């Protein structure tokens, strides 16, 4: 439960409307009582999302920097990953209907205790903990509550000083969050001591390049004559959250832990655009399991002629694996077949019930009903269709044609 003191401070912060004087790029820092540093961002100058976010330490600051990335070439999955890469504690102001049942109960109890009524646009404070690749969650950790309280107190001091000074006079600077100083506030008794803090250098993104440890399977792949086509590959963050508790039927507001967004590895046939395989994994701590999944797929579908990638993370993942498989790894600026497959996946999960549009299913079944197409399908596509047959997902007439062609090729 959020302490009532935080509600008091949040409502006081809302009254001073600091977002009318500071832009979201004009950060200030707070030296917390536990010795850590929080980087504070005031949002709302455009009137769309009024909030105060506290980013803990350099890791938090690095996630804040990502919020300012504006790349028109990012696809829906890239944008989603940026949006959910934040590491911060936030109080924002919402309509009552935007709060969940737990939050409504808490704010109602607070108002009853304080004999208050909240009125006006976006009058209700919402307290959230954002962690990278996780669903925004309730503010329950004592350290997070402390950091937000001290940031709100510092923000009120900033607002008071801006009554008689400009942001520039107080040391606020504009621009990208690199190579500049920002105000640092540190409590001394009942007041804050102000100084300047140099922003630390940004972190460089690093990605892991795992090896396949299963020597026996590598030997089997090396001896196999089964070949596949060119693979377009991408690792990206799923747009749908996952939770073991959700799978058991729990309501999201009642979960003990925040749902997380898993990663997906998508493999697409570069020639046909057919999705050959899709593996899901929770984090990059699961890379051994992902390598094993890749090995199983290569054994099933055949070794590709080449692996095509278009981003640093996927390139790093396949760097050693491609070498072990004896396959050329090629970096391309664009992979149209992969982009189309990812767009289709995004549209599928954007539907309210999570079911692919009926017209897409009908078009696929109509295509597979034509016997003439099977002789031109790559082996890996037939292998994938056979999995659908085994799962009972395809009509009998299509299943017979798939099995007949697989038998003809000795798959």
Language-model-derived ranges and their functions:
Residues 1-411:
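Secondary-structure boundary/capping micro-motif
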């Amino acid at each position: 439960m959020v302490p009532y003191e935080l509600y008091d401070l949040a409502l006081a912060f809302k009254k001073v409307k600091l977002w009318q004087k500071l832009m979201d790029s004009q950060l200030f820092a707070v030296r917390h009582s536990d010795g850590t540093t929080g980087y504070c961002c005031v949002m709302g100058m455009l009137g769309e999302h009024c909030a105060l976010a506290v980013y803990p330490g350099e890791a938090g600051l690095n996630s804040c920097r990502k919020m300012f990335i504006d790349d028109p070439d990012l696809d829906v999955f890239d944008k989603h990953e940026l949006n959910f890469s934040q590491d911060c504690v936030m109080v924002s102001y919402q309509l009552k209907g935007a709060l969940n049942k737990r939050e409504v109960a808490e704010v109602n109890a607070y108002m009853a205790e304080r004999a208050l009524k909240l009125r006006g646009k976006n009058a209700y404070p919402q307290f959230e903990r954002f962690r990278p690749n996780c669903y925004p969650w309730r503010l329950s950790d004592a350290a997070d509550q402390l950091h937000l309280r001290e940031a709100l107190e510092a923000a009120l001091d900033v607002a008071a000083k801006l009554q008689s000074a400009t942001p520039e006079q107080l040391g606020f600077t504009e621009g990208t969050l690199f190579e500049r100083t920002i105000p640092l506030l540190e409590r001394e008794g009942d007041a804050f001591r102000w100084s300047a803090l140099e922003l630390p250098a940004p972190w460089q993104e690093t990605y892991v390049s795992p090896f396949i440890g299963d020597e026996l399977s590598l030997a089997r792949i090396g001896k196999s004559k089964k070949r596949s086509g060119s693979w377009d590959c991408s690792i990206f963050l799923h747009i749908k959250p996952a939770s073991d508790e959700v799978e058991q039927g729990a309501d999201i507001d009642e979960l003990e832990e925040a749902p997380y967004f898993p990663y997906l590895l998508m493999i697409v046939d570069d020639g046909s655009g057919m999705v050959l395989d899709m593996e899901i994994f929770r984090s990059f701590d699961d890379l051994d399991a992902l390598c094993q999944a890749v090995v199983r797929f290569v054994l099933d579908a055949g070794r590709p002629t080449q692996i095509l990638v278009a981003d640093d993370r996927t390139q790093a993942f396949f760097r050693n694996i491609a070498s072990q498989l004896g396959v050329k790894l090629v970096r391309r600026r664009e992979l149209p077949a992969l982009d189309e497959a990812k767009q289709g996946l995004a549209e599928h999960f954007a539907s309210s019930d999570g079911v692919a549009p009926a017209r897409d299913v009908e078009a696929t079944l109509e295509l597979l009903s034509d016997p003439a197409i099977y002789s031109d399908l790559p082996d890996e596509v037939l292998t994938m269709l056979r999995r659908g047959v085994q799962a009972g997902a395809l009509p009998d007439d299509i299943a017979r044609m798939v099995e007949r062609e697989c038998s003809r090729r000795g798959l």
